[in-house]
A protein has these predicted regions:
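Histidine- and acidic-residue-rich, metal-dependent catalytic cores
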Residues: 2-208
Length: 208
């Protein structure tokens, strides 16, 4: 039993570290993309906060998902996993941030096939549409338990195949963003091993 508990603790620690790396990358991409979409720096910074914490609900599910991957989950358990955006919203709403609807809606799809509310098109807050693009790209270029990270061009091709899920205007601006030298450097920094970073390194990577 002790060994099982230690394995679970190690899994949750690694899951937490992975979440930090993902959150930092998504936050930086969201901040830059938001300004390209015409938002002010203050509005973009609020979205950056949303992006940093958007998956906090997954921490509540870590023990349940121990040893599994999204690919391996049966359909009923994938539906359980899809609750994480609502859990994130519920955990954060007491802080009265302006970006709670963005956290709640970051898995909504432009064609109405997303969750938790099946919003369509511009019913989805602009911030959530921006965060969705950044979040999906960051996931594709990161290692997962069931696959290696895709390179940037392959990730973009996969996203084009799924364009019905996204606001195409946001996605076209994102395509411009990811070919800028500063964005490529940001992506490369995000791939550093978090064990080699201290908190000042993480803050440096995530600064404006």
């Amino acid at each position: 039993m002790k060994n099982n508990n230690n394995e679970l603790i190690d899994y949750m620690i690694n899951d937490f570290k992975s979440g930090i790396k993902h959150g930092v990358l998504v936050a930086n991409l969201t901040y830059e993309l938001a300004q390209m979409c015409g938002l002010s720096k203050d509005e973009a910074y609020e979205l950056k906060i949303a992006a940093m914490v958007h998956d906090v609900g997954k921490l509540k599910l870590s023990e349940y998902l121990y040893g599994r991957t999204d690919e391996a989950l049966p359909e009923d358990e994938k539906q359980y996993m899809s609750m994480h955006s609502k859990i994130s919203y519920d955990l954060l709403k007491k802080y009265d941030y302006n970006i709670m609807d963005v956290v709640l809606s970051h898995h909504e799809c432009f064609d109405g096939s997303g969750y938790p509310n099946g919003l369509v098109g511009e019913q989805i807050p602009l911030g959530a549409r921006i965060l969705k693009v950044a979040d999906e790209f960051a996931a594709l270029i990161s290692d997962r338990p069931y696959r290696k990270a895709f390179d940037i061009d392959t990730a973009v091709t996969i996203m084009i195949d799924e364009i019905k899920n996204m606001d195409i205007r946001v996605f076209l601006l994102f395509q411009r963003l990811i070919h800028e030298d500063s964005t490529i450097e940001l992506i490369n920094n995000s791939r550093l091993d978090i064990d080699d970073l201290d908190i000042s390194d993480i803050l440096k990577i995530s600064q404006d």
